[in-house]
Amino acid sequence: MPNTIELSFHVKRHTDFELLRIIKAQEQGFEEPVTAFLCGVAIRARTGIGIVFGHKREDQYGRFGDGHLIRTSDVIKAEREGRFWVLTTVNSRYVIATFQRGNGRASLREFLRLSQGMHHFTPRVLQ
């Protein structure tokens, strides 16, 4: 018996509706390259939180793999491109395929309201 350890990380399967929205987003095309597509998104503390699909930096260990929960770095701007919202961070662009039920869209509206003219990013080092 080999000495192997198998780790299973929490993974959420995408629903048919989410996959359909992702396909529509991929078909639409975007002005700049997209890092990943996110489902079930809510914005909390200037970061996007959702379930990732098609991340460009997925590695051999499953980091950023489809179905994994992701917390983006600070969102610099959120704007609508065609039928979809795009979250832009320092190094990435995430397309929102679906919002979290109940408070996802409300969190985007709140982010847009609070971020107008105010850019107070998370400090790199806490004192």
Residue ranges, per PLM feature:
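N-terminal non-globular leader segments, chiefly Sec-dependent signal peptides
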Residues: 1-76, 115-127
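Short, compact, well-ordered microdomains
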Residues: 76-120
